[in-house]
Amino acid sequence: MSIKKLDYWLIESLMDTDLYKITMLQAYYHAPEFRLVDIEWKFACRNRNGLDLSILIPEIFRQLEHLCTLSFSDAELDYLAGFSFIKPDFIEFLRIFRLDMRFVHIEAKGEDISLRFSGPLLHVSLLEIYTLAIISELHTFVNCGGIDLKVARERLAEKIAYLKAEDDLSGFSFADFGTRRRASKAWHEEVLLTLKEQLPASFSGTSSLHFARTLGLPPIGTMAHEWFQSWQAVTRLADAQKAALEGWVQEYRGRLGIALTDCYSMDSFIRDFSDPYFGKLYDGLRHDSGCPFVWAEKAILMYQQMGIDPLSKTLVFSDGLNFPRMLEIWKRFKGRAKISFGIGTNLTNDVGNVPLNIVIKMIAANGRPIAKISDEPGKSMCEDLGYLQYLASQYGIDPSLVKISQ
């Protein structure tokens, strides 16, 4: 079975990605450790459930070919240069930057998609978000028949009404983290415009650089798991998490200071982070797996034991959120720390269809495995169980508890 070519391009700007892809790319660009590092990334769909994704491959390939013709415009670069944390030499690198199809390998694996990126870290990292957004939107229009805007708008209105029904939302804020799994780019834009108008006090911004620029929203983001994983390739495994935290400090000098805690586990993160040097330099922490309530209690206790007032720090929650869950967490911890949220699929792909739970993760560097473990076993992604177990042992995690998953 083949599908009809779309008569439009799903990605029309290299800015149509998340802020943290650009901030991590700049950190890689400046760090001498990564100049000769080749990285392999792998796509996985965690809820295919018999769906034939292979029919999307020709159009994915065509859309990626178009993506590789794009470059940053002068206006886009001027926008990026306006941020104090983006440096002039990196702007000049972006001015000549192009993606390259030579690093893309895609084929059918039965009815599934076998998709990998393999090449120099600086030249393959940005492929992740664009590709996920392309696959997600193709799924919407090919497998789901499009978006029922009546249903989508009703669901968005219900979310907004749910928040407005609260008597006091002072101090409550959330941002859009939904670029990678959005139902469509057009729906993504409508969601952001609606939230900007309807919830100006609570809606804090978007991870999307494109929409931050075009809609006048604050861009939100710092680092992702790839930053922590990549350090496994260039330092001792037991030191990789500390090296990643220090590398970020050296690049951003206290700016963009929200640290992701679950590349290995929250407990191992606390072991490496519970030093006033990191505790005072970083503005806060981000939760992305495991129980958010247990995680937050551990974070607050860690700060207290360092002699740091938790109310001076921000705890960001971004794992599989919906609006009731956000309010539940906020009510539990408001007044104990600054609380913020990043919400993705439930915001940009709650349109009546079943969204794909898709990821593209680093799996190897310079031909050797790398991995994340997380606070949730089902979120591990690696092709070498022996390596995953050894990595766990280096971070105080029982190797028998980790497993390879998609």
Curated annotation (Swiss-Prot):
Matches recorded under Gene3D superfamilies: nicotinate phosphoribosyltransferase
GO biological process: NAD biosynthetic process via the salvage pathway
Keyword terms, alphabetized: Ligase, Phosphoprotein, Pyridine nucleotide biosynthesis
EC code(s) of this entry: 6.3.4.21
Keyword Phosphoprotein: yes
InterPro entries recorded: N/Namide_PRibTrfase (IPR041525), NAPRTase_N (IPR040727), Nic_PRibTrfase (IPR006406), Nic_PRibTrfase-Fam (IPR007229), Nicotinate_pribotase-like_C (IPR036068)
Gene Ontology cellular-component annotations: cytosol
Name of this chain's protein: Nicotinate phosphoribosyltransferase
Taxonomic path: Bacteria, Pseudomonadati, Pseudomonadota, Gammaproteobacteria, Alteromonadales
